[in-house]
Amino acid sequence: MYQGEFNWSNLAIIGIEIHKNAVNKGFWDEELPPSHYQGMIVSELGEMINAHRAGLITKVDLDELINETDDEKFKKRFEEEVKNNYEDEGADVVIRALDALANNGESEMRTHLVDTLSQMDKSLRAELEEKGKMEEYKELSMPSRVYYIIRTAGYMDIQHGLIGSLCHIITEMRLIAETLNFDLMKHIQVKMRYNEMRPYKHSKNY
């Protein structure tokens, strides 16, 4: 389990730990094309829409969960108060993207990921501000936000390849979390801990 600070500066190291756990759980036992993992990210985006649509919102103080030392108590509270809420599904989107990035190359991830995401974040914010669309963006429905993520990620995949597409998804999720006022990094932290407790392939086929 990653023991460092959960912040955007450490995202490459966090992603590598996510990938190690995914490998241990059997998600990379079979060699599959990148489209498989991109499709799984799309499925998480769909789950985020459905959770938001159903009003499934996390109300527990995540610091309480983070500081819970008893694994069984943590697991029980996570499943009852966080799991399948829309913020949790948002964390899954980023976790899957980081997993795929780490599989693509840990060395490159350590060297370039944080700078690439920082540049993308600045570019996205500057574009929205320049066009006077930041406030409009904040008012978008969740389905609209997800549509724009998928549309642009597809374009980025064609123009810049898998890494560009995955980095764009993470960048958009960061902005979504900020504008909806939830702590994405803390949700990633508790989901990583929970995922380490889960069975092989999380009891699913893939």
Question: Where does each model-flagged region fall?
Answer:
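Flexible "arm" and connector segments at domain edges
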Residues: 1-206
